[in-house]
A protein has these predicted regions:
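Conserved cytochrome P450 K-helix/beta-meander segment immediately N-terminal to the heme-binding cysteine loop
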Residues: 61, 93-123
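Amphipathic, well-packed alpha-helical segments that form the structural scaffold of globular domains
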Residues: 8, 25, 29, 55-62
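Conserved cytochrome P450 K-helix E-x-x-R motif and the immediately C-terminal K′/meander segment
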Residues: 38-83, 102
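Cytochrome P450 catalytic-core helices
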Residues: 2-19, 23-27
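A generic secondary-structure signal for well-formed alpha-helical elements
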Residues: 14-19, 28, 32-35, 61, ...
Protein backbone atom coordinates (compact mmCIF):
# COMPACT_ATOMS: atom_id res chain seq x y z
CA UNK A 1 0.00 0.00 0.00
CA UNK A 2 2.78 2.48 0.83
CA UNK A 3 4.63 1.70 -2.41
CA UNK A 4 1.54 2.14 -4.55
CA UNK A 5 0.71 5.43 -2.79
CA UNK A 6 4.23 6.75 -3.38
CA UNK A 7 4.16 5.70 -7.04
CA UNK A 8 0.71 7.24 -7.54
CA UNK A 9 1.91 10.59 -6.18
CA UNK A 10 5.12 10.38 -8.26
CA UNK A 11 3.10 9.75 -11.43
CA UNK A 12 0.76 12.61 -10.53
CA UNK A 13 3.68 15.05 -10.12
CA UNK A 14 5.33 13.83 -13.33
CA UNK A 15 2.05 14.30 -15.20
CA UNK A 16 1.99 17.92 -14.04
CA UNK A 17 5.59 18.57 -15.10
CA UNK A 18 6.24 16.96 -18.45
CA UNK A 19 9.86 18.19 -18.57
CA UNK A 20 10.64 16.15 -15.46
CA UNK A 21 8.72 13.22 -16.94
CA UNK A 22 10.78 13.41 -20.15
CA UNK A 23 14.06 13.64 -18.24
CA UNK A 24 13.15 10.55 -16.22
CA UNK A 25 12.03 8.66 -19.34
CA UNK A 26 15.34 9.44 -21.04
CA UNK A 27 17.27 8.22 -17.99
CA UNK A 28 15.27 4.99 -17.90
CA UNK A 29 15.79 4.31 -21.62
CA UNK A 30 19.51 5.15 -21.51
CA UNK A 31 20.12 3.07 -18.39
CA UNK A 32 18.28 0.02 -19.70
CA UNK A 33 20.22 0.29 -22.97
CA UNK A 34 23.49 0.54 -20.98
CA UNK A 35 22.54 -2.73 -19.24
CA UNK A 36 22.02 -4.69 -22.49
CA UNK A 37 18.27 -3.98 -22.52
CA UNK A 38 17.81 -5.90 -19.29
CA UNK A 39 16.01 -4.45 -16.30
CA UNK A 40 18.06 -5.79 -13.41
CA UNK A 41 18.78 -4.67 -9.87
CA UNK A 42 22.06 -3.13 -11.04
CA UNK A 43 20.20 -1.30 -13.81
CA UNK A 44 17.73 0.13 -11.32
CA UNK A 45 20.58 1.19 -8.99
CA UNK A 46 22.05 3.23 -11.87
CA UNK A 47 18.89 5.33 -12.15
CA UNK A 48 19.95 8.26 -10.00
CA UNK A 49 17.28 10.69 -11.15
CA UNK A 50 14.63 8.02 -10.50
CA UNK A 51 15.86 7.87 -6.89
CA UNK A 52 15.59 11.66 -6.64
CA UNK A 53 12.04 11.61 -8.01
CA UNK A 54 10.96 8.95 -5.53
CA UNK A 55 12.72 10.67 -2.62
CA UNK A 56 11.11 14.01 -3.50
CA UNK A 57 7.74 12.26 -3.70
CA UNK A 58 8.27 10.85 -0.21
CA UNK A 59 9.36 14.28 0.97
CA UNK A 60 6.27 16.03 -0.37
CA UNK A 61 3.85 13.19 0.43
CA UNK A 62 5.29 11.35 3.44
CA UNK A 63 3.65 8.02 4.20
CA UNK A 64 4.08 8.68 7.94
CA UNK A 65 3.26 12.32 8.73
CA UNK A 66 4.65 11.79 12.24
CA UNK A 67 7.29 9.51 13.70
CA UNK A 68 7.17 8.30 17.30
CA UNK A 69 10.50 7.90 19.08
CA UNK A 70 11.53 7.21 22.65
CA UNK A 71 14.17 9.42 24.26
CA UNK A 72 17.34 7.43 24.93
CA UNK A 73 18.57 9.93 27.53
CA UNK A 74 17.44 13.10 29.27
CA UNK A 75 17.56 16.02 26.83
CA UNK A 76 17.47 19.68 27.79
CA UNK A 77 15.85 21.73 25.03
CA UNK A 78 18.46 24.27 23.83
CA UNK A 79 17.59 27.78 24.97
CA UNK A 80 14.88 26.48 27.29
CA UNK A 81 16.56 24.90 30.35
CA UNK A 82 13.21 24.36 32.09
CA UNK A 83 12.08 22.00 29.32
CA UNK A 84 13.57 18.54 29.64
CA UNK A 85 12.62 15.50 27.61
CA UNK A 86 13.10 12.70 30.12
CA UNK A 87 14.70 9.40 29.23
CA UNK A 88 12.01 6.96 28.10
CA UNK A 89 9.52 9.71 27.18
CA UNK A 90 7.77 9.28 23.83
CA UNK A 91 8.37 12.11 21.37
CA UNK A 92 6.43 12.88 18.20
CA UNK A 93 8.57 14.07 15.28
CA UNK A 94 6.46 15.93 12.69
CA UNK A 95 7.81 14.58 9.39
CA UNK A 96 5.67 16.88 7.30
CA UNK A 97 6.68 19.87 9.44
CA UNK A 98 10.35 19.21 8.72
CA UNK A 99 9.80 18.46 5.03
CA UNK A 100 7.72 21.61 4.56
CA UNK A 101 10.10 23.93 6.43
CA UNK A 102 11.06 26.64 3.89
CA UNK A 103 14.37 27.18 5.71
CA UNK A 104 15.37 23.64 4.75
CA UNK A 105 13.39 23.16 1.55
CA UNK A 106 12.75 26.45 -0.29
CA UNK A 107 9.34 26.43 -1.98
CA UNK A 108 8.24 23.27 -0.14
CA UNK A 109 5.01 22.98 -2.14
CA UNK A 110 6.99 22.74 -5.38
CA UNK A 111 7.93 19.28 -6.66
CA UNK A 112 11.67 19.60 -7.28
CA UNK A 113 13.74 16.37 -7.41
CA UNK A 114 16.93 18.46 -7.75
CA UNK A 115 16.72 19.38 -4.05
CA UNK A 116 17.58 15.72 -3.37
CA UNK A 117 20.51 15.41 -5.76
CA UNK A 118 23.78 14.08 -4.34
CA UNK A 119 25.26 17.60 -4.31
CA UNK A 120 22.24 19.09 -2.54
CA UNK A 121 22.21 16.32 0.06
CA UNK A 122 25.83 17.02 0.99
CA UNK A 123 24.85 20.59 1.92
CA UNK A 124 21.98 19.54 4.20
CA UNK A 125 21.91 17.84 7.58
CA UNK A 126 21.11 14.13 7.16
CA UNK A 127 18.13 14.36 9.54
CA UNK A 128 16.31 16.86 7.31
CA UNK A 129 14.83 14.08 5.16
CA UNK A 130 12.92 11.46 7.06
Amino acid sequence: ETSSTTLAFALYELALQTKLQERLRQEIEATIKKHNNEFTYECMEDMHYMKQVLAETQCKYPIAPNLMRQAAADYVVPGHPNYVIKKGMMVTIPTIGIHYDPATYPEPDKFDPERLSADALRLRDSVDWL
